[in-house]
């Protein structure tokens, strides 16, 4: 599935060029020409990344970032600012407000795509990874599927993220706090016991195939994902 990118840019020639480049590189661009239309695009399916101009009719890029960070469903969407404001102070303001990267106009299409991919690797590794396999269990980040052989396993989005983290970090013990930081993120305030709830749900989802044994409790420490039973 193509990664969905919201392009928020009021200058039509730049917006159209960016969308063309994104399509040529396998992304799915969604256009917004001003602040209000950008806000209206914040719904499911959520964008995987937002390219955001600094100055917009109806509001500023910084205001838009602040709006994103206030809402639980949008606060983790990565943002790359796309603007003519190249002064160091402006770059710092953008990054401190919550932007993940900053591209100054004019820019090359190659640099734009490279920066988008770099941000996705850093912020959302599942967006660029191949299928992960372990002991007959396979997880495909692109299609968001977990399989055992030809049989799909049904699980919620949090359990999927938890399993993805475990399968990319096997044989290591993680405390509840570490799992919260890695899977939920440092900006989300939830209790440690939330991890236990989702561990139980993950085990339940893996139970039919027998892979629930791989999610192991390490008493007094936390949890480990292991092929050693």
From Swiss-Prot:
It is found in: Cytoplasm. Keywords: Activator, Cytoplasm, DNA-binding, Phosphate transport, Phosphoprotein, Transcription, Transcription regulation, Transport, Two-component regulatory system. It comes from the Bacteria. InterPro entries: CheY-like_superfamily (IPR011006), OmpR/PhoB-type_DNA-bd (IPR001867), Sig_transdc_resp-reg_PhoB (IPR011879), Sig_transdc_resp-reg_receiver (IPR001789), WalR-like (IPR039420), WH-like_DNA-bd_sf (IPR036388). Its main location: cytoplasm. The modification 4-aspartylphosphate is found at residue 53. Residues 129-227 bind DNA. Phosphorylated by PhoR. One of its GO terms (cellular component) is cytosol. The keyword DNA-binding applies. It holds the Pfam family Trans_reg_C. This protein is a positive regulator for the phosphate regulon. Transcription of this operon is positively regulated by PhoB and PhoR when phosphate is limited. NCBIfam families: PhoB, PRK10161.1. This is Phosphate regulon transcriptional regulatory protein PhoB. It comes from Klebsiella pneumoniae. The gene is phoB.
């Amino acid at each position: 599935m193509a990664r969905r990118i919201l392009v928020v840019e009021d200058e039509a020639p730049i917006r159209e060029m960016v969308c063309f480049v994104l399509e040529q590189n396998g992304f799915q661009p969604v256009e917004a020409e001003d602040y209000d239309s950008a806000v209206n695009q914040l719904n499911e399916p959520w964008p995987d990344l937002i390219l955001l101009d600094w100055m917009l009719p109806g509001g500023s890029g910084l205001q838009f970032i602040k709006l994103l960070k206030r809402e639980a469903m949008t606060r983790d969407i990565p943002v790359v600012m796309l603007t003519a404001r190249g002064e160091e102070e402006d770059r710092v303001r953008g990054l401190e407000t919550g932007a993940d990267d900053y591209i100054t106009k004019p820019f090359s299409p190659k640099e734009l795509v490279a920066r988008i991919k770099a941000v996705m690797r850093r912020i959302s590794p599942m967006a660029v990874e191949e299928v992960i396999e372990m002991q007959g269990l396979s997880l495909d980040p692109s299609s968001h599927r977990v399989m055992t052989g030809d049989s799909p396993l049904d699980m919620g989005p949090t359990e999927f993220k938890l399993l993805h983290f475990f399968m990319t970090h096997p044989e290591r013990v993680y405390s509840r706090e570490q799992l919260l930081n890695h899977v939920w993120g440092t900006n989300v305030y939830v209790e440690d016991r939330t991890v236990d709830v989702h561990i139980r749900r993950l085990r339940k989802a893996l139970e039919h195939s027998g892979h629930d044994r791989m999610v192991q409790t390490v008493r007094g420490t936390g949890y480990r994902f292991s092929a050693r039973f």
